[in-house]
Amino acid sequence: HRVRVNALLPAQTETPMIAEQVGEERQRREERIPLGRYAQPSEMASAIAFLGSDDASFITGHALAVDGGYLAFGFRPSVYG
């Protein structure tokens, strides 16, 4: 059947709920992301569109981290209190 199954591992993404984070908490969380910011919804959408496109026709069984380098930098439990 040639079904491809992939997953997106998203980082914190700018949404109305996330936009309510301000001050030191937000700054501390953003500092833990190597790119220094939260993702934009369009960046997540682009990754999803890629995985569903013919450009990704030979990709299956993959979990794509769209996280600004967070996983490469390493999980920091102290960020979450």
Give a label for each model feature.
Residues R2-R4, I59-G61:
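Short, small/polar-rich loop/turn modules that mediate ligand/substrate recognition or access, typified
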Residues A19-I33:
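A short C-terminal helix-loop "cap" of Rossmann-like NAD(P)-dependent dehydrogenase/epimerase domains
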Residues I33-M44, D55:
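A conserved structural motif in NAD(P)-dependent oxidoreductases
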Residues E14, D54-D55:
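Catalytic "switch" loops of ABC-type ATPases
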